Amino acid sequence: REERENPGAQLTSDCRGNLRIHAQEFKKKHGDQLGVGTEPEMMWLTKNEDGTPTGKGFSKPYCYHIDQFESLRPVFMKVFEYARAMGFDMIQGDHEDAPGQLELNWMYDDVLRNADRLSTYRQICAQVAREFNIIACFMTKPFMGVSASGCHTNMSLWTGGKDKINKLHHKSLPGMDEVFTYVEGGTNTFMPDTKDVQLPGKIGLKAIGGVMKHLGA
């Protein structure tokens, strides 16, 4: 920043910087680390010769239909190829309710690294769309009459655990160690701590209550 006073101050509109600071402060205060796994839905749409959207998806709107999923195999395999080269441990994928709507997931991790991967994933999809002459659409609802795209965000608080490099079968890493780093081990404090195996533990219940209280934010 170029201010005369405190030019090295945090930019308050920096979303990533805010997330990093809050996560570090929380861990320092409570000793827990926030783990996050996201489930990004998006649509692969067709376009006209002039590049404008046709308003149609590449596949038909059949949820969890293997044929619709396979029709996009060349596309999502290219996404996997690029993602793996950039440190993504891809773990699952499926076709959702809307036309051309896929959800491709990677391993959960530290909240900041997952946020970085989520942002990078959108860029990967955009590049793959260019190569296949289609549109990678992350709009929530690009047209009416179909299910919208969302992004489930699975949160948990962990104690312990260590950062470990996952080479993802690369003989030598094609990028920095940090890009291929994931938290391994530790204890999920949301797990049941009573005889009820379906009821989250005390910390989990408090976290759920806190999230519900502040949903409006």
Question: Residue locations for each model-derived region?
Answer:
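Glycine-rich, acidic/polar active-site loops that bind/position phosphate-bearing ligands
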Residues: 1-217
